[in-house]
């Protein structure tokens, strides 16, 4: 990791430890996904938690998140909750370190996620959440988690 990425991870950990949310914003291609994954990996070790974290992103980025997670956090058990093969049983979402879904799937499967305790929620492409009256913003706000981070 580059020094500015390490600083970003340290800042995300500081926010989480102080029960604050935050927005990690920079230019495209500077490693926000890597920083978020390093943050989640550090958090998982620090908290020794069995709770999964959730990444909510545009459908076009799901595969990128899955690939980057396998590359940078091979120890993570990852579930992509998207498409026609996704589960409708909330208990089948337990046992994972990271669940990746899209904003549209989160809205459609709101009942599944509303009662699922999460370690951290990461909303990628935060412009999808600018208006708090939208279904995207309401669905992500309804989630129960110990921390929340947005990326943009």
Place the predicted regions along the sequence by residue.
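ASCE P-loop NTPase motor core, strongest for the SF2 helicase catalytic module
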Residues: 1-152
